[in-house]
C-alpha cells in the first residue's frame, strides 16, 4: 500500500507551483544551456556542458520527488478542523517555561515544513510531543539540543 503524505492545501499548492515552474521554465532553460554548451565542441573538457548536465540531473530528480509527493498527497483542509486538542494542521502558541519567550508553530507535513516560516513537521520532536495535548497543558520536548518545557497557550485552526 502506498503511504499517504499529509499536507495542507497551501502546502500542496506550493509544491504544485514548484513542479510547474521546474517543468515549464527550468527544464527548457537547462535543455537550451546544454545545446549551447554542446555547440562549443569537445564535451570532455567543456565545463559549461557538465554544469548544465548536473543541473539537469538535480532538476529532474526534484521533479520526480515532487510528482511522487503530490501523487501521494492526503490534503487536509485545516479551516474545517476545530477543537482544543492538538493534531495535524493546528497552529499552536507556546510559552517557554524557562524564559517566558513566546513561539507560534503550525504542525504540517514533512514536505511543507519550514521552521523559518513557523511550520514544523508532524514527525519533529516538538510536534510529536504536542499531538493530543490541549491548551493550558505543559509539555516537555526532548530534542537534540536538550530538554525544554513549554506551556500551551493557544490552539488555533487557520
Curated annotation (Swiss-Prot):
<comment type="function">
    <text>Necessary for efficient RNA polymerase transcription elongation past template-encoded arresting sites. The arresting sites in DNA have the property of trapping a certain fraction of elongating RNA polymerases that pass through, resulting in locked ternary complexes. Cleavage of the nascent transcript by cleavage factors such as GreA or GreB allows the resumption of elongation from the new 3'terminus. GreA releases sequences of 2 to 3 nucleotides.</text>
</comment>
<keyword id="KW-0805">Transcription regulation</keyword>
<dbReference type="InterPro" id="IPR036953">
    <property type="entry name" value="GreA/GreB_C_sf"/>
</dbReference>
<dbReference type="GO" id="GO:0070063">
    <property type="term" value="F:RNA polymerase binding"/>
</dbReference>
<dbReference type="InterPro" id="IPR006359">
    <property type="entry name" value="Tscrpt_elong_fac_GreA"/>
</dbReference>
<dbReference type="InterPro" id="IPR022691">
    <property type="entry name" value="Tscrpt_elong_fac_GreA/B_N"/>
</dbReference>
<feature type="coiled-coil region">
    <location>
        <begin position="47"/>
        <end position="74"/>
    </location>
</feature>
<dbReference type="GO" id="GO:0032784">
    <property type="term" value="P:regulation of DNA-templated transcription elongation"/>
</dbReference>
<keyword id="KW-0804">Transcription</keyword>
<dbReference type="InterPro" id="IPR028624">
    <property type="entry name" value="Tscrpt_elong_fac_GreA/B"/>
</dbReference>
<keyword id="KW-0238">DNA-binding</keyword>
<keyword id="KW-0175">Coiled coil</keyword>
<dbReference type="InterPro" id="IPR036805">
    <property type="entry name" value="Tscrpt_elong_fac_GreA/B_N_sf"/>
</dbReference>
<dbReference type="InterPro" id="IPR001437">
    <property type="entry name" value="Tscrpt_elong_fac_GreA/B_C"/>
</dbReference>
<dbReference type="GO" id="GO:0003677">
    <property type="term" value="F:DNA binding"/>
</dbReference>
<comment type="similarity">
    <text>Belongs to the GreA/GreB family.</text>
</comment>
<dbReference type="Pfam" id="PF01272">
    <property type="entry name" value="GreA_GreB"/>
</dbReference>
<dbReference type="InterPro" id="IPR018151">
    <property type="entry name" value="TF_GreA/GreB_CS"/>
</dbReference>
<dbReference type="GO" id="GO:0006354">
    <property type="term" value="P:DNA-templated transcription elongation"/>
</dbReference>
<dbReference type="InterPro" id="IPR023459">
    <property type="entry name" value="Tscrpt_elong_fac_GreA/B_fam"/>
</dbReference>
<protein>
    <recommendedName>
        <fullName>Transcription elongation factor GreA</fullName>
    </recommendedName>
</protein>
<dbReference type="Pfam" id="PF03449">
    <property type="entry name" value="GreA_GreB_N"/>
</dbReference>
Amino acid at each position: 500500500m502506498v503511504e499517504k503524505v499529509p499536507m495542507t492545501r497551501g502546502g500542496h499548492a506550493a509544491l504544485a507551483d514548484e513542479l510547474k515552474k521546474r517543468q515549464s521554465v527550468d527544464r527548457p532553460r537547462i535543455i537550451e544551456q546544454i545545446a549551447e554548451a554542446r555547440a562549443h565542441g569537445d564535451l570532455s573538457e567543456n565545463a559549461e556542458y557538465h554544469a548544465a548536465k548536473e543541473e539537469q540531473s538535480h532538476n529532474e530528480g526534484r521533479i520526480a520527488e515532487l510528482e511522487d509527493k503530490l501523487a501521494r498527497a492526503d490534503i487536509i483542509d485545516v479551516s474545517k478542523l476545530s477543537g482544543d486538542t492538538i493534531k495535524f494542521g493546528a497552529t499552536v502558541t507556546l510559552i517557554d517555561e524557562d524564559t517566558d519567550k513566546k513561539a507560534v508553530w503550525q504542525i504540517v507535513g514533512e514536505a511543507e515544513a519550514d521552521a523559518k516560516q513557523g511550520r514544523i513537521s508532524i514527525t519533529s520532536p516538538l510536534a510529536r510531543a504536542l499531538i493530543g495535548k490541549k491548551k493550558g497543558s505543559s509539555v516537555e520536548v526532548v530534542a537534540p539540543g536538550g530538554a525544554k518545557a513549554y506551556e500551551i497557550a493557544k490552539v488555533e485552526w487557520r
